[in-house]
Regions:
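Generic structural signal for small/hydrophobic residues in well-ordered secondary structure
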Residues: 14, 39, 58, 71, ...
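Catalytic active-site module of serine/aspartate enzymes centered on a nucleophile-bearing elbow/loop
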Residues: 120-157
Length: 157
């Protein structure tokens, strides 16, 4: 919002800024691998997307003090900074791609972004949780590509 003159368009997906549904009880069991696995699975409509490699990466992140502090700071910032009154200032094309079954940032948040941002387009991916680009990468990339193609065509006219 501070440098809109340097941005041609934006794409939001599962974005914070209006409503936050935390992962519940934070990371009280951060050293419990099974707990981290369950929280990771909760992110997706299809819990099998939470591969061992992904769970390992998240487990290592939350158990690395410096990384965990950054994650917590980012989450607290999202809770403190509600952007509802600022979104109407976005005067560039906005592409919103949302998981239809997002438990972290529910679909109504994406719908609200669409209402509040002028010139915004919302696309919903069914059977998809919070991380659409991971759960349905082909569909996500096709939607992003179409938005950018349409934007480029408009700019050429």
């Amino acid at each position: 919002l501070k440098n809109m003159d340097k941005v041609a368009s934006i794409t939001l997906t599962g974005s914070s800024g209006l409503f936050e549904n935390s992962l519940g009880d934070g990371y009280p069991n951060k050293e419990n691998y099974d707990y981290i696995r369950k929280k990771t699975e909760y992110t997706f409509y299809d819990p099998t997307v939470a591969s061992k490699e992904l769970v390992d990466e998240i487990f290592n992140t939350v158990n690395d003090r410096a990384k965990a502090i950054r994650v917590i700071a980012l989450a607290k910032s999202a809770l403190r900074h509600n952007l509802r009154k600022e979104l109407n200032k976005i005067d560039i094309p906005a592409n919103i791609i949302w998981g239809g079954n997002d438990n972290i940032t529910p679909l109504f948040v994406g719908e609200e972004f669409q209402k509040l941002i002028p010139n915004a387009k919302l696309s919903v991916i069914d059977k998809c949780g919070h991380a659409a680009m991971m759960e349905h990468p082909e569909r996500f990339n096709a939607l992003l590509d179409q938005f950018l193609t349409d934007l480029n065509v408009k700019n050429l006219e």
